[in-house]
C-alpha cells in the first residue's frame, strides 16, 4: 500500500469525485439492470446472449454494487444510507446492512460471525451457511436492538420492513417490464 501520500485530514468537500462516483452508482445500476431486462424481453436474442447478459449483470451488481453499498452504509448521511439500501434491494440482499453493521463488525473472526469462514471450511459449505445464517443473525440483532428500546421486533422502526418493501418493489418492477 502506498500510504506515504495519505492525508487523513481531508474534509468531505475535498472528496467530491470519490463521493460523486459512489452516489451516482445506484441510479446507473438501476438503469443498467432494468435496461438489460427490457432489452432481453423486447429484442430477439439467442438464449446464450441472454444468459451472458444476466451473468455479466450479476457480476456487475455483485462486485461493484455490493461494494458501493458497503461503502455507503458506513456513511452517516441519510442519502448515502438510502442509496446503500437501494443497491442491496436490487440484488435482494437487503439484510446485509444489518448483518454487516450489527453482527460482522462486532463478532468478526469469531464463531458468532456467519461471514467468517471456519478453518478448512470449503467454499460451498461456507456459501450455503452464509445464505442461511446471515438473514437470521441480522434479524436477531435488529430484534435485540429494538428490545433495548423496549420495542418488539414487529415495531415499524425495524428496518426489515424497509428491506422487504424495497425488495418487493424491485421484484414488482422486474415483472412489469
Question: Residue locations for each model-derived region?
Answer:
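Transmembrane helix-loop junctions in multipass membrane proteins, especially transporters and channels
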Residues: 37-45, 74-75, 110
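Membrane-embedded catalytic scaffold of the fatty acid hydroxylase/desaturase
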Residues: 55-165
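Alpha-helical bilayer-embedded segments of polytopic membrane proteins, i.e.
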Residues: 1, 16-41, 48-62, 155-177
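Membrane-helix interface/capping segments
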Residues: 2-11
Amino acid at each position: 500500500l502506498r500510504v506515504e501520500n495519505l492525508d487523513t485530514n481531508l474534509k468531505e468537500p475535498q472528496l467530491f469525485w470519490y463521493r460523486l462516483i459512489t452516489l451516482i452508482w445506484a441510479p446507473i445500476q438501476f438503469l443498467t439492470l432494468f435496461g438489460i431486462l427490457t432489452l432481453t424481453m423486447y429484442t430477439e436474442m439467442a438464449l446464450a446472449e441472454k444468459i451472458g447478459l444476466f451473468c455479466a449483470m450479476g457480476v456487475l451488481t455483485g462486485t461493484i454494487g455490493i461494494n458501493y453499498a458497503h461503502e455507503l452504509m458506513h456513511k452517516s448521511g441519510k442519502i448515502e444510507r438510502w442509496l446503500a439500501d437501494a443497491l442491496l434491494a436490487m440484488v435482494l440482499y437487503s439484510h446485509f446492512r444489518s448483518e454487516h453493521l450489527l453482527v460482522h463488525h462486532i463478532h468478526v473472526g469469531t464463531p458468532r460471525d456467519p461471514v467468517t469462514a471456519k478453518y478448512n471450511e470449503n467454499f460451498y459449505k461456507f456459501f450455503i451457511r452464509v445464505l442461511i445464517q446471515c438473514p437470521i443473525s441480522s434479524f436477531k440483532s435488529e430484534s435485540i436492538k429494538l428490545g433495548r428500546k423496549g420495542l418488539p421486533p414487529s415495531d415499524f422502526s425495524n428496518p426489515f420492513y424497509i428491506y422487504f418493501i424495497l425488495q418487493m418493489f424491485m421484484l414488482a418492477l422486474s415483472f412489469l417490464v
